[in-house]
């Protein structure tokens, strides 16, 4: 057989040296844009129906929950993260046209990143961005920065208004930080917003704080996990086979920076389960509706919502902290051994889960 030959068009199919992939969705479609140290970040939302009551305060209350500088355990970068709605809203209601939203960057401190301009940081996108595109914005990670999620949060605020009208509720909280896990028996929704980690277990939150204090003292950080519960989801959302609800949820969540794993229902625990304990048995409620006695499947069967609560779990990796005696590489590929630490790189976070 002859050897395959690839023409210049193969670069298009393999991704080329342009950055595509900033748009997600079908009916309700979002495109996030901007870099950590650019003029601003934002999102364009396409597919929002006309007539939805919407103002900047509706968006701002969501952004205020993720903005930096609210806790000693998150990045100290000070940003107001004030949203500006540029289009798609008139006299307090959506017009059905694309909604563009902007958040201006204010506290970039780009000079803090000048030392790492020619280095690849472990655990960051520095290396792959440079190898793929031949050029990268090293200031705060550029497009791979956590500030990319501002656009997602702003779009999510609109989505939540639509879902609220449909009676669909979403609850998200931190399940674990390091080895400290919220006890389901101590679940208290009222304490989620009362601790800096959004944990539903007050005792676990206290222990998480002590654990992160120790991490910070050692110039280290921690990973964690987040759980999400979607309630009142109607039956029948999702299509086999490549448009499964589970697959689309996974794509959306795994595209968030620092997310390394995604689970639905019992998730990875099913690898250790037996069939007779894992299968959700059916019964009927007093109205004759078919319901499940358990929910190991997490509310999705065959990629289609079954009407029960949808349970999601996300694993988040720790941030880069001090890496004593670690090996770094310069852009020209010379290996460099740092006996004490890599070059300092701006703002740091002890644990990402809160945001």
Model-flagged regions — what are they?
Residues 39-51, 147-168, 243, 247-251, ...:
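Alpha-helical support elements that line or immediately flank enzyme active sites
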Residues 3-18:
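Short, Lys/Arg-enriched N-terminal segments with co-localized hydrophobic residues
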Residues 117-142, 325-346:
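Short acidic, glycine/tyrosine-flanked loop/strand segments centered on an H-E-D-like triad
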Residues 20-77:
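N-terminal, positively charged regions that mediate nucleic acid binding
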Residues 69-88, 181-184, 191-202, 215-216, ...:
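A structural-propensity feature for long, helix-poor, extended segments
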Residues 131-241:
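Glycine-rich, mobile lid/loop segments that gate access to catalytic sites or pores
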Residues 33, 39, 219-222, 226-336:
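Glycine-rich anion/phosphate-binding loop at the beta-strand->alpha-helix junction
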Residues 63-122, 126:
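Glycine-rich, N-terminal phosphate-binding loop and its surrounding beta-alpha-beta segment
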């Amino acid at each position: 057989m002859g050897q395959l030959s690839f023409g210049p068009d193969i670069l298009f199919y393999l991704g080329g040296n342009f950055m595509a992939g900033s748009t997600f969705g079908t009916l309700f479609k979002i495109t996030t844009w901007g870099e950590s140290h650019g003029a601003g970040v934002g999102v364009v939302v396409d597919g929002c129906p006309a007539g939805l009551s919407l103002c900047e305060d509706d968006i701002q209350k969501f952004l205020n929950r993720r903005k930096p500088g609210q806790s000693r355990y998150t990045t100290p970068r000070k940003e107001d993260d004030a949203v500006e709605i540029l289009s798609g809203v008139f006299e307090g209601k959506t017009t059905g046209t694309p909604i563009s939203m902007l958040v201006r960057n204010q506290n970039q401190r780009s000079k803090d990143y000048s030392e790492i301009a020619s280095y690849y940081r472990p655990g960051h996108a520095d290396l792959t961005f440079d190898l793929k595109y031949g050029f990268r914005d090293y200031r705060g990670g550029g497009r791979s920065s956590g500030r990319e999620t501002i656009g997602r949060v702003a779009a999510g605020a609109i989505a939540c208004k639509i879902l609220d009208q449909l009676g669909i509720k979403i609850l998200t909280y931190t399940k674990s930080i390091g080895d400290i896990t919220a006890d389901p028996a101590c679940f208290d929704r009222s304490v989620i917003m009362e601790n800096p980690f959004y944990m539903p277990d007050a005792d676990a939150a206290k222990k998480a704080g002590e654990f992160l204090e120790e991490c910070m003292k050692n110039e280290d950080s921690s990973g964690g996990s987040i759980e999400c519960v979607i309630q009142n989801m109607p039956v029948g959302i999702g299509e086999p086979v490549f448009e499964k609800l589970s697959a689309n949820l996974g794509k959306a969540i795994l595209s968030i920076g620092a997310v390394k794993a995604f689970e639905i229902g019992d998730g990875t625990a099913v690898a250790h389960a037996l069939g007779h304990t894992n299968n959700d048995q059916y019964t009927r409620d007093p109205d004759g509706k078919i319901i499940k006695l358990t929910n190991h499947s997490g509310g999705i069967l065959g990629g289609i919502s079954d009407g029960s609560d949808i349970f999601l779990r996300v694993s988040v990796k720790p941030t880069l902290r001090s890496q004593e005696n670690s090996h770094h590489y310069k852009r020209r590929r010379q290996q460099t051994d740092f006996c004490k630490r890599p070059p300092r790189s701006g703002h740091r976070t002890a644990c990402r889960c809160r945001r």
